[in-house]
Every structure is written in structure tokens, then in C-alpha cells.
Amino acid sequence: MEKIIMIGLAVMLISVPAHAAYVTAESGLCVREKPDEESERVRVLPIGTEVDGEITDGWMQIGDGYISTDYIGDEDPLELIGTWRVTAYAYTGSACANGEMPEMGRTIAHNSLPFGTRIYIEGVGVREVMDRGPAYLGTEWCDLYLGDVAECVNWGDQTREIWLVK
């Protein structure tokens, strides 16, 4: 938060400590070396990461760098669903169950979550339910669209924490 204090004709910008906030950018938030969008990227914080630091001119200073306050909010954008089995599938030549074509970096299949539901898969990122899968796999499972059979084989069958994007 920033406070502007006017003394006569002079204006002073005072930095104040921030309360806990959360990364809201679904694609992650870049930590920069300096408080400038053109500055070198140090790393990326995933959606839902809790951050705390001093805010000045729209930038929060955290440990090793700065993040833009445009992409943080007061409420955690994620709700933990649980630990699921995550498999992968490749392009079959047809549209997803919702009628759209599958997209790398966007599509997952799930048996019961409504189409359009966005979930965060640990270590993968945010994906959208666009397709359905075999009912025998249950509801604590999702199928990640990777688009390439070799990538799917390499992915295998993994277990990951899953969060609902609110």
C-alpha cells in the first residue's frame, strides 16, 4: 500500500509494509531484479503463492526481487481439492467432449468437473476441463493433454496435488 502525504507544495511517497497477499496470475508472476517490467526475470512464482513485502510505486519487494502489485490479491485464488492421479493423452484427431479442439497448455480431461473449470496442477500450471475420460478412473484423476505420444509416455502416471482456481 502507498500513502501520499502533501506538505505544502511538496509530495512525498511513503512505503508501508504490506499484509499477506497471493499471486493471482494464472500463468505465474515474474520476480524481477528491479521494480521495472523490463528488468531481468529472477524466477516465476506460481498462482496462489503467498507473498509479503514492502510496496512502493506498484511494486512489492520480496526476498530476491520485485513483483508487480497488479497481479496479487488479498484472497488465495486456489482451493486445495486433494492429491490426484495425473495421466497424459495425445491428439486423437477429434474435438474434445466440449466441442473444442484440444490445446497444449490448456486442456485436461476429467469425469465430473464441469467444462470450463480451471484447476492448478502442482508443477504443471493451470489447465481447463475440456474433455472427459474413462469413468472407471474415478474422480480423483485427470488426463493432461500433451499433444505428443512420446511426451505422454515420458509423463507416465504421476500423483500431484490439485487445486481449484476460484
Question: Language-model features: where?
Answer:
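Extracellular/lumenal glycan-associated surfaces
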Residues: 29-30, 63-65
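Short intrinsically disordered terminal tails
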Residues: 1, 18-20, 166
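A structural connector/turn signal
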Residues: 39-40, 108
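SH3-family beta-barrel domains
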Residues: 8-30, 43-47, 54-57, 73-81
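Core beta-strand residues in small-molecule sensory/regulatory alpha/beta domains
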Residues: 32-34
